[in-house]
Amino acid sequence: MAKTPSKKAAKAPKKAGSKRNKRVETYSSYIYKVLKQVHPDTGISKRGMSIMNSFINDIFERLAGEASRLARYNKRSTLSSREIQTAVRLMLPGELAKHAVSEGTKAVTKFTSN
């Protein structure tokens, strides 16, 4: 009995201007780093990471929307750290807002000093 050629279709050669798959950017590496700082012996599942990523995207969109609204109310065309800080104070409850503002201020100070 003769061996028959495989039935897999040959891939078409790539065109010069063919589109590449767009990379999906996530916060997973940052979530993992924070998790290891807080609980070094704890892991996270793919589904848990996906939920955390969605959560961060949601909070980011809400804060950006609120900051944008604040800038529009004050007839500003540029978002500054002040609008972001006010949006954080409006969106997050009590202690969480205080911690977020202090961490944000610390990050901005570190960024501008380098």
Swiss-Prot record:
Principal place of residence: nucleus
Post-translational modification: Monoubiquitination of Lys-110 gives a specific tag for epigenetic transcriptional activation and is also prerequisite for histone H3 'Lys-4' and 'Lys-79' methylation.
Region (Disordered): 1-22
Transmembrane portions of the chain: none
Key words of the record: Acetylation, Chromosome, DNA-binding, Isopeptide bond, Nucleosome core, Nucleus, Ubl conjugation
Modified residues (N6-acetyllysine): 3
Pfam families assigned to the protein according to its UniProt record, in alphabetical order: Histone
Ubl conjugation found in the keyword field: yes
Compartment(s): Nucleus; Chromosome
Cystine bridges: none
InterPro entries: Histone-fold, Histone_H2A/H2B/H3, Histone_H2B, HISTONE_H2B_site
GO cellular component, one term: nucleosome
Molecular function in Gene Ontology: DNA binding; protein heterodimerization activity; structural constituent of chromatin
Cross-link Glycyl lysine isopeptide (Lys-Gly) (interchain with G-Cter in ubiquitin) residue location(s): 110
Family named by the database record: Belongs to the histone H2B family.
Subunit annotation: The nucleosome is a histone octamer containing two molecules each of H2A, H2B, H3 and H4 assembled in one H3-H4 heterotetramer and two H2A-H2B heterodimers. The octamer wraps approximately 147 bp of DNA.
Summary of the function given for this chain in its UniProt record: Core component of nucleosome. Nucleosomes wrap and compact DNA into chromatin, limiting DNA accessibility to the cellular machineries which require DNA as a template. Histones thereby play a central role in transcription regulation, DNA repair, DNA replication and chromosomal stability. DNA accessibility is regulated via a complex set of post-translational modifications of histones, also called histone code, and nucleosome remodeling.
Protein name: Histone H2B
Organism: Olisthodiscus luteus (Marine phytoflagellate)
